[in-house]
Regions:
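Alpha-helix C-terminal capping segments
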Residues: 1, 27-28, 57-64, 100-101
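Phosphate-coordination/substrate-recognition cap region in phosphate-metabolizing enzymes
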Residues: 1-32, 83, 93
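Alpha-helical packing segments of well-folded alpha/beta enzyme cores
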Residues: 48, 52-60
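Active-site catalytic microenvironments for nucleophilic, acid-base chemistry
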Residues: 62, 81-85
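Generic beta-sheet signal
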Residues: 63-73
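Phosphate- and divalent-cation-binding pockets in alpha/beta enzyme and binding domains
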Residues: 77-78
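Domain-level recognition of soluble alpha/beta enzyme cores
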Residues: 85-110
Length: 113
């Protein structure tokens, strides 16, 4: 029997308020989107990516064998700071991509099918 828990600590990054309610096409036309693509840690936001990392890291540190099913920026924040990456978007997961940490190294699961 496996126990599991659900936590609000892995909710989406509470980023830019002026993106809420807009389509992706509209968002891509903003100056913030240019910064987001280059170095999102430079954005002035409601919640920094480091703050996102801190709330996710708390779960990671308090559990063994942790599986996070979450939005891309939330998991990327965690991986970026946990692994001390040099560039935020370097190892950004693709949609539905499975990434994991093994021996403090980022690994990617490749579906053999």
């Amino acid at each position: 029997k496996m126990e599991f828990s659900i936590s609000e600590k892995i909710t989406e990054w509470d980023g830019l308020l002026n993106w809420k309610g807009y389509t992706f096409d509209e968002i891509t036309e903003t100056n913030e989107y240019l910064i987001y693509n280059d170095d999102p840690t430079e954005l002035s936001t409601n919640e920094t990516f480091f703050e996102t990392f801190q709330r996710v890291e708390e779960l990671y540190n308090n559990n063994n064998h942790t599986l996070f099913v979450t939005h891309q920026d939330t998991i990327r924040s965690f991986m970026f700071y946990k692994l001390k990456s040099k560039k935020f978007n370097q190892d950004k997961p693709g949609h539905c991509e499975l990434q994991y940490i093994e021996n403090d190294t980022l690994q990617k699961y490749t579906n053999p099918v």
